[in-house]
């Protein structure tokens, strides 16, 4: 199964944070699943790093590719269809990064691994 990680799920997985549910961890660790991280999440993390709200274990351009490879996590590019879908979404959520994740989930029919229950209002499949 293809699964799209919300940014917090990715970070909590990497840091072995107890906030990541046991079920979410199982989904991510299941080698039969194709785990994806949106390019939007990379942008979100980069902004948080530049604002001093996030620290990671090294330089962004070295740490992120290393962790993606180490954990067999693929990147989901942002397509025109994804950005067009954002324009049609109701405003259940104002966070632009989360709205892009919702659009990617809907367009690509890929469930989101996230603790954020507001995603449910969009009709996406959320796994936690």
What positions do the PLM features span?
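Short, well-structured N-terminal submotif of metal-dependent ribonuclease cores
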Residues: 1-37, 51-66, 108, 117, ...
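Residue-level signal for well-ordered alpha-helical positions
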Residues: 16-17, 48, 89, 125
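Short, conserved active-site loop motifs that form the nucleotide-linked donor/cofactor pocket
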Residues: 33, 73, 124
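Binuclear metal-dependent hydrolase catalytic cores
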Residues: 42, 50
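Phosphate/NTP-binding elements of NTP-utilizing enzymes
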Residues: 45
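Acidic, glycine-centered active-site loop in nucleotide-sugar glycosyltransferases
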Residues: 122-128
């Amino acid at each position: 199964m293809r699964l799209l990680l919300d940014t917090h799920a990715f970070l909590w997985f990497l840091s072995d944070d107890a906030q990541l549910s046991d079920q979410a961890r199982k989904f991510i660790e299941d080698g039969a699943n194709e785990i994806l991280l949106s390019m939007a999440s990379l942008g979100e993390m980069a902004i948080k790093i530049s604002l001093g709200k996030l620290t990671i274990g090294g330089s962004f351009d070295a740490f992120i590719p290393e962790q993606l490879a180490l954990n067999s996590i693929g990147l989901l590019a942002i397509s025109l269809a994804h950005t067009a879908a954002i324009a049609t979404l109701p405003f259940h959520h104002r966070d632009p990064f989360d709205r892009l994740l919702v659009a990617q989930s809907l367009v690509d029919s890929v469930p989101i691994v996230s603790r954020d229950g507001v995603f449910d209002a969009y009709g996406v499949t959320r796994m936690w």
